[in-house]
């Protein structure tokens, strides 16, 4: 699997360097995100979705809406600013865990997900309590998925009034 524009900075950089005399076509492919929706069986339109690269989330104080689906890619590489390595940066991972536990309860269920690499193989889907994030078996392919908190989903009273006026 793989999409040429998803976690593919070198390819996008190469495309940006081409001049207009070279015609290029970027064909879509199936990404981890597509596999995630199918394997975990959820619709991102239900509650919305937020997705972040783990290191981007760590560095730039991204705001998470707990009422939406949250996907944090490359959680096993968080804090790695160099070449991919199988060594986990537990200090960075624990920092993310702390940020997430401030938003969710410690026992909030989350999933470590890895899409199947080849046809006929199975994805890795491991459910756990968020407070156990630093105890999960992670690789460079690991994605963290946190389902939405239904309790926090409250429709806007102004929008409801508007819709009642329109209908």
Show which residues each predicted segment covers.
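Beta-strand/loop-alpha-helix module characteristic of Rossmann-like adenine-cofactor folds
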Residues: 8-18, 22-167
